Amino acid sequence: MVKAVVGFGAACGISAIVACLWAALVITNDINDMYDDVMGELGGFRDISDDTWGTLLDVRHGAGESAEQYVRGIFGRHKRSNSQCSCGLPSQGCPAGAPGNPGAPGEPGGTGPDGKNGPTGLPGLNIPIPNDFPKECIKCPAGPPGQDGLPGQEGFQGLPGDAGKRGTPGKDGEPGRVGDIGDQGTPGQDGQPGLAGPPGRDGLTGKGQPGVAGRPGMPGPRGEPGNNGNPGEEGQTGAQGPTGQPGKDGFNGNDGTPGQAGPQGAVGADAEYCPCPERKRRRV
């Protein structure tokens, strides 16, 4: 939308400029035409005045008066002489005296009498005009070319012309000679790494002799402790060891439950004293 508005405004501005230029050209052309018309009228008036002036001079020449006297009689001024008395004796061979001071300016002369009427002109001729008389103006032969006039003012700049047509393509020129080898240029920047190529074919197994064994490498660092091993199998029963020393007497156990009543005993023998139990030895 903004582009359309800007384009419309630009088109209106260009149209206004073109219209102003066209109006200026039209006005300038009208002024030149009016100037030519005025100069033509002035030339005609000048011709008429020259003819009239020549006629007046011819009339005065017929009366015995020169043209210079006639002009002075019209445009000149008759000075009045100062009233002086000429009663003295006239000079006889005396040298001329010094020039006197300029006299006072005279009074303006009065209006001269009107000139006499000119002679009556010849009566005009009544020339019949035939019907087949050409209505166009009579073309007089061209006079000698006049002097060059003053250079005119610089005209307005014309409107831009249309774009010229595209010319035909020219012929290919002859190949030029091989030029000299130029100076070595600066090394270019490193290119970008290329794309990965397709996988190559499988290589052939070499048939060379085995090489000499290399030197043993340095011992590597100590590894981490291994995991605990599985429990070993139960070993065979060993030989019986020597008899250990008798242990300490244990604590008396709890009384057992009373047993069942035994059968009735047989009649015992006559009463006798039971033998005493043996005395136990204390072990250290």
Curated annotation (Swiss-Prot):
Changes after translation: May be a substrate of bli-4.
Keywords: Collagen, Cuticle, Disulfide bond, Repeat
Gene Ontology annotations of biological process type: collagen and cuticulin-based cuticle development; cuticle development involved in collagen and cuticulin-based cuticle molting cycle; post-embryonic body morphogenesis
Molecular function GO labels: structural constituent of collagen and cuticulin-based cuticle
Superkingdom assignment: Eukaryota
InterPro entries (UniProt xref): Col_cuticle_N, Collagen
Bias kind Gly residues: ranges: 106-115
Segments of skewed composition (Low complexity): 181-193, 224-246, 255-271
Biased composition range(s): Basic and acidic residues: 163-177
Annotated region described as Triple-helical region, given as residue ranges: 94-126, 143-270
One GO cellular component term: cuticular extracellular matrix
Region feature Disordered, mapped onto this chain: 88-284
Subunit relationships: Collagen polypeptide chains are complexed within the cuticle by disulfide bonds and other types of covalent cross-links.
PANTHER family, per database record: COLLAGEN (PTHR24637), CUTICLE COLLAGEN DPY-5 (PTHR24637:SF257)
Function: Nematode cuticles are composed largely of collagen-like proteins. The cuticle functions both as an exoskeleton and as a barrier to protect the worm from its environment.
UniProt family annotation: Belongs to the cuticular collagen family.
Protein name: Cuticle collagen dpy-5
Organism: Caenorhabditis elegans
